[in-house]
Design a protein with these regions (language model features):
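Glycine-rich phosphate/pyrophosphate-binding loop regions near the starts of catalytic domains
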Residues: 3-162
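Aromatic/hydrophobic pocket-lining residues that form π-stacking "cages" and hydrophobic walls in ligand
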Residues: 73, 105, 109, 225, ...
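Helix N-cap motif at beta-to-alpha junctions
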Residues: 273-279
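Phosphate/diphosphate-binding glycine-rich loops and adjacent basic-rich segments that engage nucleotide
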Residues: 143-196
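Acidic, Ser/Thr/Pro-rich beta/coil linker or hinge segments at domain junctions
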Residues: 3-5, 9-14, 21, 287-334
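Solvent-exposed alpha-helices and their adjacent loops that cap or buttress functional pockets
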Residues: 31-33, 41-47, 113, 128-133, ...
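Beta-strand->loop->alpha-helix junctions that form or flank phosphate-binding loops
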Residues: 30-33, 216-217, 235-244, 262-264, ...
Protein backbone atom coordinates (compact mmCIF):
# COMPACT_ATOMS: atom_id res chain seq x y z
CA UNK A 1 0.00 0.00 0.00
CA UNK A 2 1.37 3.41 -0.98
CA UNK A 3 1.58 5.75 1.99
CA UNK A 4 0.86 9.47 1.86
CA UNK A 5 1.81 12.38 4.12
CA UNK A 6 -0.05 12.64 7.40
CA UNK A 7 -1.68 10.09 9.66
CA UNK A 8 -1.34 6.44 8.73
CA UNK A 9 -4.57 4.87 7.44
CA UNK A 10 -6.54 2.65 9.85
CA UNK A 11 -5.66 -0.60 8.09
CA UNK A 12 -1.92 0.10 8.47
CA UNK A 13 -2.36 1.06 12.12
CA UNK A 14 -4.31 -2.14 12.79
CA UNK A 15 -1.82 -4.30 10.92
CA UNK A 16 1.40 -3.01 12.43
CA UNK A 17 0.81 -0.90 15.54
CA UNK A 18 -2.35 -1.41 17.57
CA UNK A 19 -1.46 -4.88 18.80
CA UNK A 20 2.12 -3.96 19.63
CA UNK A 21 1.64 -2.92 23.25
CA UNK A 22 4.55 -4.67 24.91
CA UNK A 23 3.76 -6.47 28.14
CA UNK A 24 0.00 -6.75 28.78
CA UNK A 25 -1.29 -5.03 31.91
CA UNK A 26 -4.56 -5.21 33.79
CA UNK A 27 -3.94 -1.57 34.71
CA UNK A 28 -4.35 -0.41 31.10
CA UNK A 29 -7.96 0.80 31.12
CA UNK A 30 -8.09 2.48 27.70
CA UNK A 31 -5.77 0.83 25.20
CA UNK A 32 -4.49 2.22 21.88
CA UNK A 33 -7.39 2.51 19.47
CA UNK A 34 -8.18 4.33 16.23
CA UNK A 35 -9.97 7.60 16.91
CA UNK A 36 -9.35 7.61 20.67
CA UNK A 37 -7.30 10.62 21.78
CA UNK A 38 -5.59 9.21 24.88
CA UNK A 39 -4.74 6.18 26.98
CA UNK A 40 -5.87 5.59 30.56
CA UNK A 41 -3.85 3.76 33.21
CA UNK A 42 -4.93 2.67 36.70
CA UNK A 43 -2.37 4.02 39.17
CA UNK A 44 -3.91 2.97 42.48
CA UNK A 45 -6.67 0.92 43.97
CA UNK A 46 -10.14 1.79 45.17
CA UNK A 47 -11.12 5.39 44.58
CA UNK A 48 -7.67 6.51 43.40
CA UNK A 49 -7.75 8.57 40.21
CA UNK A 50 -6.53 7.13 36.92
CA UNK A 51 -3.77 8.60 34.77
CA UNK A 52 -4.74 9.97 31.35
CA UNK A 53 -1.90 10.28 28.80
CA UNK A 54 -1.71 11.67 25.26
CA UNK A 55 1.09 12.51 22.83
CA UNK A 56 1.07 14.63 19.68
CA UNK A 57 3.64 16.05 17.24
CA UNK A 58 3.69 19.40 15.51
CA UNK A 59 5.34 18.89 12.13
CA UNK A 60 3.74 21.23 9.59
CA UNK A 61 4.31 24.65 11.14
CA UNK A 62 7.27 26.62 12.49
CA UNK A 63 5.80 29.94 13.61
CA UNK A 64 4.42 29.66 17.16
CA UNK A 65 5.32 25.97 17.23
CA UNK A 66 5.65 26.07 21.03
CA UNK A 67 2.08 27.36 21.37
CA UNK A 68 0.75 24.69 19.03
CA UNK A 69 2.74 21.88 20.66
CA UNK A 70 1.32 22.51 24.12
CA UNK A 71 -2.24 23.03 22.96
CA UNK A 72 -2.62 20.01 20.68
CA UNK A 73 -1.76 17.47 23.39
CA UNK A 74 -3.61 19.42 26.08
CA UNK A 75 -6.68 19.32 23.84
CA UNK A 76 -6.48 15.54 23.49
CA UNK A 77 -6.45 15.07 27.26
CA UNK A 78 -9.23 17.65 27.65
CA UNK A 79 -11.53 15.51 25.47
CA UNK A 80 -11.69 13.13 28.43
CA UNK A 81 -13.51 15.87 30.36
CA UNK A 82 -10.50 16.52 32.61
CA UNK A 83 -7.96 19.33 32.86
CA UNK A 84 -4.42 18.67 31.57
CA UNK A 85 -1.84 19.01 34.36
CA UNK A 86 1.69 17.97 33.36
CA UNK A 87 3.74 17.97 30.15
CA UNK A 88 6.93 16.51 28.72
CA UNK A 89 8.40 17.50 25.37
CA UNK A 90 10.84 16.31 22.72
CA UNK A 91 12.16 19.23 20.68
CA UNK A 92 14.03 18.32 17.48
CA UNK A 93 15.75 21.26 15.82
CA UNK A 94 17.22 21.69 12.32
CA UNK A 95 20.99 21.75 12.00
CA UNK A 96 21.02 25.51 11.39
CA UNK A 97 19.11 26.28 14.60
CA UNK A 98 20.51 28.95 16.89
CA UNK A 99 19.94 29.96 20.49
CA UNK A 100 17.19 32.39 19.48
CA UNK A 101 15.12 29.52 18.08
CA UNK A 102 15.61 27.52 21.28
CA UNK A 103 14.64 30.51 23.44
CA UNK A 104 11.57 31.26 21.32
CA UNK A 105 10.21 27.71 21.41
CA UNK A 106 10.87 27.16 25.11
CA UNK A 107 9.36 30.49 26.16
CA UNK A 108 6.27 29.89 23.99
CA UNK A 109 5.79 26.50 25.60
CA UNK A 110 6.24 27.82 29.12
CA UNK A 111 3.79 30.71 28.65
CA UNK A 112 1.20 28.49 27.02
CA UNK A 113 1.48 25.79 29.68
CA UNK A 114 1.21 28.37 32.47
CA UNK A 115 -1.92 29.82 30.88
CA UNK A 116 -3.52 26.36 30.94
CA UNK A 117 -2.42 25.61 34.51
CA UNK A 118 0.08 22.98 33.37
CA UNK A 119 3.59 22.19 34.63
CA UNK A 120 6.43 21.12 32.32
CA UNK A 121 8.22 18.26 34.07
CA UNK A 122 10.98 17.37 31.61
CA UNK A 123 11.90 16.36 28.08
CA UNK A 124 14.68 16.21 25.52
CA UNK A 125 16.05 18.77 23.04
CA UNK A 126 18.54 18.20 20.21
CA UNK A 127 19.75 19.30 16.78
CA UNK A 128 18.60 16.57 14.41
CA UNK A 129 20.23 15.79 11.04
CA UNK A 130 18.06 16.17 7.96
CA UNK A 131 15.39 18.48 9.38
CA UNK A 132 14.36 21.61 7.48
CA UNK A 133 12.26 22.98 10.33
CA UNK A 134 11.74 22.12 14.01
CA UNK A 135 9.51 19.28 15.16
CA UNK A 136 8.05 19.29 18.67
CA UNK A 137 6.38 16.27 20.27
CA UNK A 138 4.54 16.71 23.56
CA UNK A 139 3.08 14.25 26.04
CA UNK A 140 0.44 15.54 28.44
CA UNK A 141 -0.88 13.92 31.63
CA UNK A 142 -3.96 14.34 33.79
CA UNK A 143 -5.53 12.54 36.75
CA UNK A 144 -9.20 11.62 36.54
CA UNK A 145 -11.90 9.83 38.52
CA UNK A 146 -14.30 9.84 35.57
CA UNK A 147 -13.89 10.39 31.84
CA UNK A 148 -15.39 9.85 28.41
CA UNK A 149 -13.63 8.65 25.25
CA UNK A 150 -14.33 9.03 21.55
CA UNK A 151 -15.51 5.40 21.57
CA UNK A 152 -18.53 6.11 23.79
CA UNK A 153 -20.93 7.69 21.27
CA UNK A 154 -24.33 6.01 20.94
CA UNK A 155 -26.87 5.57 18.18
CA UNK A 156 -29.25 8.55 18.08
CA UNK A 157 -26.81 10.97 19.74
CA UNK A 158 -26.56 14.43 18.23
CA UNK A 159 -23.25 15.33 16.63
CA UNK A 160 -22.21 18.79 17.82
CA UNK A 161 -19.13 20.92 17.20
CA UNK A 162 -17.70 24.04 18.79
CA UNK A 163 -16.39 27.18 17.06
CA UNK A 164 -16.05 26.61 13.30
CA UNK A 165 -14.30 24.38 10.76
CA UNK A 166 -10.62 24.65 9.82
CA UNK A 167 -9.51 26.82 12.75
CA UNK A 168 -5.87 25.71 12.93
CA UNK A 169 -5.45 25.41 9.18
CA UNK A 170 -6.74 28.94 8.70
CA UNK A 171 -4.08 30.31 11.04
CA UNK A 172 -1.29 28.24 9.46
CA UNK A 173 -2.15 28.91 5.82
CA UNK A 174 -3.30 32.54 5.91
CA UNK A 175 0.05 33.84 4.70
CA UNK A 176 0.17 31.26 1.87
CA UNK A 177 -3.19 32.22 0.36
CA UNK A 178 -2.73 34.41 -2.75
CA UNK A 179 -4.76 37.53 -3.40
CA UNK A 180 -6.11 38.11 0.11
CA UNK A 181 -6.33 41.60 1.56
CA UNK A 182 -3.92 42.33 4.40
CA UNK A 183 -6.80 42.74 6.86
CA UNK A 184 -8.16 39.26 6.04
CA UNK A 185 -4.71 37.70 6.44
CA UNK A 186 -4.24 39.44 9.79
CA UNK A 187 -7.58 38.19 11.12
CA UNK A 188 -6.95 34.68 9.82
CA UNK A 189 -3.46 34.49 11.34
CA UNK A 190 -4.98 35.43 14.70
CA UNK A 191 -6.97 32.18 14.69
CA UNK A 192 -4.10 30.54 16.54
CA UNK A 193 -5.61 32.13 19.66
CA UNK A 194 -8.66 29.86 19.23
CA UNK A 195 -6.62 26.66 19.35
CA UNK A 196 -7.55 25.46 22.85
CA UNK A 197 -10.62 23.34 23.62
CA UNK A 198 -9.77 22.89 27.31
CA UNK A 199 -12.46 25.23 28.66
CA UNK A 200 -15.23 24.18 26.27
CA UNK A 201 -14.53 20.47 26.87
CA UNK A 202 -14.75 21.01 30.64
CA UNK A 203 -17.96 23.01 30.22
CA UNK A 204 -19.61 20.38 28.03
CA UNK A 205 -18.53 17.51 30.29
CA UNK A 206 -19.92 19.27 33.37
CA UNK A 207 -23.48 19.01 32.01
CA UNK A 208 -23.49 15.21 32.19
CA UNK A 209 -25.06 15.19 28.72
CA UNK A 210 -21.92 14.42 26.72
CA UNK A 211 -21.13 10.80 25.90
CA UNK A 212 -18.01 11.28 23.76
CA UNK A 213 -15.64 14.04 22.64
CA UNK A 214 -12.93 14.30 19.99
CA UNK A 215 -10.58 17.09 18.94
CA UNK A 216 -10.77 17.99 15.23
CA UNK A 217 -7.08 17.76 14.39
CA UNK A 218 -5.73 16.21 11.19
CA UNK A 219 -8.52 15.60 8.69
CA UNK A 220 -10.63 18.41 10.13
CA UNK A 221 -14.28 18.12 11.10
CA UNK A 222 -14.95 15.33 8.62
CA UNK A 223 -11.91 13.36 9.78
CA UNK A 224 -12.92 13.74 13.42
CA UNK A 225 -16.47 12.57 12.67
CA UNK A 226 -15.07 9.53 10.89
CA UNK A 227 -12.68 8.70 13.73
CA UNK A 228 -15.31 9.09 16.43
CA UNK A 229 -17.78 6.91 14.51
CA UNK A 230 -15.05 4.35 13.81
CA UNK A 231 -14.08 4.19 17.48
CA UNK A 232 -17.75 3.85 18.50
CA UNK A 233 -18.53 1.44 15.62
CA UNK A 234 -21.40 3.63 14.47
CA UNK A 235 -22.48 5.34 11.30
CA UNK A 236 -22.91 9.10 11.08
CA UNK A 237 -24.56 11.77 9.01
CA UNK A 238 -22.77 15.12 8.81
CA UNK A 239 -24.73 18.01 7.31
CA UNK A 240 -22.39 20.33 5.41
CA UNK A 241 -24.98 23.13 5.50
CA UNK A 242 -24.95 23.13 9.31
CA UNK A 243 -21.15 23.22 9.76
CA UNK A 244 -20.05 26.76 10.70
CA UNK A 245 -17.29 28.07 8.41
CA UNK A 246 -15.98 31.57 9.11
CA UNK A 247 -15.49 34.18 6.42
CA UNK A 248 -11.71 34.10 6.89
CA UNK A 249 -11.62 30.32 6.53
CA UNK A 250 -13.74 30.46 3.37
CA UNK A 251 -11.42 33.06 1.85
CA UNK A 252 -8.25 31.12 2.70
CA UNK A 253 -9.67 27.83 1.44
CA UNK A 254 -11.05 29.39 -1.74
CA UNK A 255 -7.70 30.99 -2.55
CA UNK A 256 -5.86 27.70 -2.08
CA UNK A 257 -8.52 25.36 -3.51
CA UNK A 258 -9.16 23.56 -0.21
CA UNK A 259 -12.18 22.00 1.50
CA UNK A 260 -12.66 23.57 4.97
CA UNK A 261 -14.32 20.40 6.31
CA UNK A 262 -11.10 18.46 5.63
CA UNK A 263 -8.73 21.12 6.98
CA UNK A 264 -6.92 20.61 10.28
CA UNK A 265 -8.99 22.23 13.02
CA UNK A 266 -7.42 21.98 16.45
CA UNK A 267 -9.57 24.30 18.52
CA UNK A 268 -12.78 22.71 17.26
CA UNK A 269 -14.33 20.11 19.55
CA UNK A 270 -16.64 17.38 18.26
CA UNK A 271 -19.19 16.05 20.74
CA UNK A 272 -21.65 13.18 20.94
CA UNK A 273 -24.56 14.54 22.97
CA UNK A 274 -27.55 12.58 24.21
CA UNK A 275 -30.80 13.55 22.53
CA UNK A 276 -32.42 16.44 24.37
CA UNK A 277 -29.17 17.73 25.87
CA UNK A 278 -28.10 19.93 22.96
CA UNK A 279 -29.34 23.26 24.35
CA UNK A 280 -27.85 22.59 27.78
CA UNK A 281 -24.45 21.78 26.29
CA UNK A 282 -24.53 24.82 24.00
CA UNK A 283 -25.43 27.09 26.92
CA UNK A 284 -22.65 25.69 29.14
CA UNK A 285 -20.02 26.09 26.42
CA UNK A 286 -21.15 29.65 25.69
CA UNK A 287 -21.24 30.61 29.38
CA UNK A 288 -17.87 29.17 30.42
CA UNK A 289 -15.79 29.29 27.23
CA UNK A 290 -17.49 32.02 25.22
CA UNK A 291 -17.78 29.65 22.26
CA UNK A 292 -20.76 28.45 20.29
CA UNK A 293 -21.71 24.79 19.97
CA UNK A 294 -23.75 23.76 16.94
CA UNK A 295 -25.64 20.59 16.03
CA UNK A 296 -24.18 19.43 12.70
CA UNK A 297 -25.40 15.85 12.38
CA UNK A 298 -26.19 12.64 14.19
CA UNK A 299 -24.82 9.21 14.94
CA UNK A 300 -26.53 6.26 13.26
CA UNK A 301 -26.89 2.59 14.09
CA UNK A 302 -23.95 0.27 14.72
CA UNK A 303 -22.21 -0.44 11.43
CA UNK A 304 -24.38 2.13 9.63
CA UNK A 305 -23.36 4.33 6.74
CA UNK A 306 -20.96 7.24 7.15
CA UNK A 307 -22.21 10.12 5.03
CA UNK A 308 -21.50 13.76 4.28
CA UNK A 309 -24.69 15.47 3.10
CA UNK A 310 -23.62 18.22 0.70
CA UNK A 311 -25.05 21.75 0.56
CA UNK A 312 -25.84 21.47 -3.13
CA UNK A 313 -27.77 18.25 -2.61
CA UNK A 314 -26.87 14.61 -2.60
CA UNK A 315 -24.65 12.73 -0.20
CA UNK A 316 -21.06 11.57 -0.27
CA UNK A 317 -20.02 8.31 1.41
CA UNK A 318 -17.07 8.62 3.80
CA UNK A 319 -15.32 5.26 3.54
CA UNK A 320 -11.98 6.28 5.03
CA UNK A 321 -10.51 9.19 6.97
CA UNK A 322 -9.73 12.09 4.63
CA UNK A 323 -6.20 13.24 3.91
CA UNK A 324 -5.81 16.65 5.51
CA UNK A 325 -5.90 19.61 3.13
CA UNK A 326 -2.85 21.10 4.85
CA UNK A 327 -0.69 18.38 3.32
CA UNK A 328 -1.74 19.46 -0.17
CA UNK A 329 -0.25 22.88 0.42
CA UNK A 330 2.90 21.56 2.09
CA UNK A 331 3.37 19.11 -0.80
CA UNK A 332 3.20 21.98 -3.31
CA UNK A 333 5.88 23.82 -1.33
CA UNK A 334 8.33 20.89 -1.31
Amino acid sequence: MELTLGKLPPEILKRYLLGMVGAPSKDLLVAPSIGVDFGVVRVGGGSSPSLIVSSDPVTGVEERIGWYAVNVSANDVATSGNSPRFLQSVIMLPEDADERMIARISSEMSRTAKGLGMTIVGGHTELTPGLKRPIVVTTVFAFARSYVTAADAREGDSLMMTKSAGVEGTAILASQAPGLEAAVVKRARAYFRKLSVVEEAAAAFSTGRVRAMHDCTEGGVLGAAYEMSYASRLGFELMEAKVPVSGETRRVCSALGLDPLRLISSGTLLLSVEKGGEDEVAAAVRRRAGSRATVVGRFLRRGGRRTLVRIQGGSEPVREPPVDELWKVLHRMR
